[in-house]
Curated annotation (Swiss-Prot):
<dbReference type="InterPro" id="IPR000836">
    <property type="entry name" value="PRibTrfase_dom"/>
</dbReference>
<dbReference type="InterPro" id="IPR010079">
    <property type="entry name" value="Xanthine_PRibTrfase"/>
</dbReference>
<comment type="similarity">
    <text>Belongs to the purine/pyrimidine phosphoribosyltransferase family. Xpt subfamily.</text>
</comment>
<keyword id="KW-0328">Glycosyltransferase</keyword>
<feature type="binding site">
    <location>
        <position position="20"/>
    </location>
    <ligand>
        <name>xanthine</name>
    </ligand>
</feature>
<protein>
    <recommendedName>
        <fullName>Xanthine phosphoribosyltransferase</fullName>
        <ecNumber>2.4.2.22</ecNumber>
    </recommendedName>
</protein>
<dbReference type="InterPro" id="IPR029057">
    <property type="entry name" value="PRTase-like"/>
</dbReference>
<dbReference type="InterPro" id="IPR050118">
    <property type="entry name" value="Pur/Pyrimidine_PRTase"/>
</dbReference>
<feature type="binding site">
    <location>
        <position position="27"/>
    </location>
    <ligand>
        <name>xanthine</name>
    </ligand>
</feature>
<dbReference type="GO" id="GO:0005737">
    <property type="term" value="C:cytoplasm"/>
</dbReference>
<dbReference type="GO" id="GO:0046110">
    <property type="term" value="P:xanthine metabolic process"/>
</dbReference>
<feature type="binding site">
    <location>
        <begin position="128"/>
        <end position="132"/>
    </location>
    <ligand>
        <name>5-phospho-alpha-D-ribose 1-diphosphate</name>
    </ligand>
</feature>
<dbReference type="Pfam" id="PF00156">
    <property type="entry name" value="Pribosyltran"/>
</dbReference>
<keyword id="KW-0660">Purine salvage</keyword>
<dbReference type="GO" id="GO:0032265">
    <property type="term" value="P:XMP salvage"/>
</dbReference>
<keyword id="KW-0808">Transferase</keyword>
<comment type="subunit">
    <text>Homodimer.</text>
</comment>
Length: 193
């Protein structure tokens, strides 16, 4: 997605040779017009697959996921990273390791929001090692629902997340694919769209 790649080049910052900071439009402050365009692109790509729910993980996946759900006219569910006293029955959980934060969290979704009839589109802000998506897949499958595809805003193609997910049989669509960081600049790999 050319618009996203241009924004990454303009406002993204490389940290430690393997982390891209995009807090000015995605991971802290949100550019809603860009997120709306991202949502439309994902919705157009997956409209024919019968998606009934969009699922993400808090926090930075929420903006692109909610705009995708809006464009598809389906509910969006986000997995919570912290235990909540109001979520006390029928909770579906998985362990997720965060590459950026270097911690493992138990993420959860109330089971009442997913059913075996659901066809789910996972949306996330980044794909690095695939652990967030893997955890969401585990939760979705605990409910008996089906993962139709995984939509990623920014993929770090130099890490093994995509390979892990595709080998497990899940289609992955990334709007921006980072090939590498070179001389303080992002070098893109051809995106899926």
């Amino acid at each position: 997605m050319k618009l996203l790649e241009e924004r990454i080049l303009k406002d993204g910052h490389i940290l430690d040779d393997n982390i891209l900071k995009v807090d000015s439009f995605l991971t802290h402050q949100v550019d809603f017009s860009l997120m709306r365009e991202i949502g439309k692109v994902f919705a157009e790509k997956f409209a024919a697959t019968g998606i009934t729910k969009v699922v993400t993980i808090e926090a930075s996946g929420i903006a692109p996921a909610v705009f995708t759900a809006e464009a598809l006219n389906v509910p969006m569910i986000f997995a919570k990273k912290a235990k909540n006293i109001t979520m006390n029955e029928g909770i579906l959980t998985a362990q997720v390791y965060s590459f950026t934060k270097q911690v493992t969290s138990t993420v959860s979704i109330a089971g009442k929001f997913l059913s075996p009839e659901d066809k789910v589109l996972i949306i996330d802000d980044f794909l690095a090692n695939g652990q967030a998506a893997k955890g969401l897949i585990q939760i979705i499958e605990q409910a008996g629902a089906t993962v139709q595809a995984i939509g990623i805003v920014i993929e770090k193609s130099f890490q093994d997340g995509r390979d892990l997910l595709e080998k497990a049989g899940y289609p992955v669509l990334s709007l921006a694919r980072l090939d590498r960081f070179e001389n303080g600049q992002v070098v893109f790999k051809e995106a899926d769209l």
